[in-house]
Amino acid sequence: MSTVRESWLKPKKNIQTNLGDYEDMDKISRLPDDLLVKVLLFLPTKIAVSTSILSKRWEFLWMWLPKLEYHNTNYSASEEQRLRSFINLNLQLHRAPIIESLRLKFSLGRSIKPQNIKQWIIIAVFRCVRELSINLFPLYCIENPAKLPSSLYISKSLVILKLKDQILVDVPRMAYLPSLKYLLLKRVTYKDSNSLHQLLSSCPVLKNLVVERDEYNHDETLSITVSSLQRLTLKISRGGSFDELVINTPSLKYFKLTDYLGECETELDDDSYSYVFKDMPKLEEAHIDSTYPDIGKFVRSITSVKRLSLCVKVNAEEALYREGICFKQLEHLKLCPCDSNWSKLLARLLKDSPNLRELEIKLNKDHKASFDDPACLENQLNYVVQSSIPSLERFTWTWIYGSQNEIDYLEKLKKRLLLTNWQNLV
């Protein structure tokens, strides 16, 4: 084992000699093993392994580490081969009774193959891994996504699972993850349209879900149905065949939705998709960044929020949402002014938020400010200046630039609403 370790690390002789000379005066080495292992936890795995050359006292301490991380970033072909041999030999001999965390980040196709990843995951699951993070990307575009072992989907110990990029999600029928609370799926490939549903159905205590759907996913519907879920973050490529977003999460407290156009997509008139949102009575915070114009379809599900951030497309000719909807608990509102009719949305939200305390107008990252139609802006202003929100304490305007009409608009709002805290950043 020592030969494999040294061939991976390749320590320089003069460094090894200096460290050996320093051994007699090394006070840290006198600490108990469990304390030294805690010290090693602050180091990257490769550096922690390199401490084995310090002395016999340190030779196998790293093998008690409960957290391991391996990657082949900027590795040559020969270095990859040594790393693969090192993991093959040492992971199965690792001395920690439980592997709390295993993180693997590899490019596939040269020395590291899908079967290597599969074998390492099998070992980790057998050792009761609690956190597993797999990030795979192809060295060559022709590489197929890696299929993970079936044992992963029946792990009783797994609490956190993160899967990214070149991974095939193929969920067996007996899948059951009784301890999984955090699940991240970014740009993965699903075996079929039912794979995500099968995976979510196997997680009875799931609390936090992050899903990113890229333009290469051709499923028409993204459906999230998890009764226990409390936090949901979605990033969706809205082009291609994507047609519908369905969310049924009655315990949800935090919701973030972002849609975008992928690199291979262009802006089209029919690139919108439909929302089917079930009631979310416990929702406290929502961030919506979407170009889909039918605001009314999701507003009914977010009326319980205390914090709301919106960047949505507003149709100047249609009503925003039905009368009678009220955001009674809303205290903090953030609005992105990149749509040409943003002032219409602001006017309506001010009317329907009687307990609003903080109002923030801020351009989202990578968004471009729009210039409202002067007539539309004036109409909205005439309505808003008649409003009174005594609860409002702070109005923040963070913007790159704005038209004179928009600046005047916000100045009048400030004066009318008698704000006690005003910040105007141009």
UniProtKB/Swiss-Prot annotation:
Disulfide bonds: none
Limits of the F-box domain: 25-71
Parts of the chain that traverse the membrane: none
Keyword line: Leucine-rich repeat, Repeat
LRR repeat ranges, renumbered to this chain: 50-75, 80-106, 160-187, 188-213, 221-259, 265-290, 311-337, 338-363, 373-399
UniProt xrefs under SUPFAM superfamilies: F-box domain, RNI-like
Highest taxon of the lineage: Eukaryota
PANTHER family in UniProt: F-BOX/RNI SUPERFAMILY PROTEIN-RELATED, FBD DOMAIN-CONTAINING PROTEIN
Protein name: Putative F-box/LRR-repeat protein At4g15060
